[in-house]
Amino acid sequence: MKITHHCLVSLLSILLLSGFAFSHHISLDEFESHPSTSRALLQAKATCKEDFAAKNYTIITSKCKGPNYPAKVCCSAFKDFACPFAEVLNDEKTDCASTMFSYINLYGRYPPGIFANMCKEGKEGLDCTDVTPTSSSHASIPLVSTHVLLITVSILFHLF
């Protein structure tokens, strides 16, 4: 999957225009896995326009470490990373949430469902009102081939 200059300009325009209307919560539904049904072709999700392959996940992986995975530290780091993307993560018509979690698990090698089980703040999901966007969650990962990562995540996603 190659990102063209036109796609990048379109993505940046959309992000710029939607920056003022982002959600202040990450829905709990995005943490849960949804079983596939026989109508999978009719329910296919659109590809996420946010390039989660190029994000810097060290904001999570440098703070949330095993074997104990302290909930307060891990959830805070997760919110710092994910809250700037709350609007796209809550869009159930796209695969943004599953894509982001695939990369988080790829880089952090976290146990399945760790953030879903630990990070709960209410019926609307995680509250992002107290999280300020940082440039680190939007930074690119240097020296890593996006194509190799995309293939790896695709293989892992299909295996599990």
Swiss-Prot record:
Maturation-removed propeptide residues: 138-160
Keywords carried by this UniProt record: Cell membrane, Glycoprotein, GPI-anchor, Lipoprotein, Membrane, Signal
Mode of membrane association: Lipid-anchor; GPI-anchor
GO terms under biological process: positive regulation of reactive oxygen species biosynthetic process; protein localization to plasma membrane; regulation of pollen tube growth
Region forming the signal peptide: 1-23
Cited InterPro entries: LORELEI-like
Effect of deleting the gene: No aborted seed phenotype and normal production of seed sets.
Cellular component terms per the entry's GO annotation: plasma membrane; pollen tube; side of membrane
Tissues expressing the protein: Expressed in pollen, pollen tubes, sporophytic pistil tissues, in the early stages of female gametophyte development, and in unfertilized, mature ovules.
Lipid-acceptor residues (GPI-anchor amidated serine): 137
Glycosylation site residues: 56
Predominant cellular place of this UniProt entry's protein: membrane
Protein location: Cell membrane
Name of the protein in its database record: GPI-anchored protein LLG3
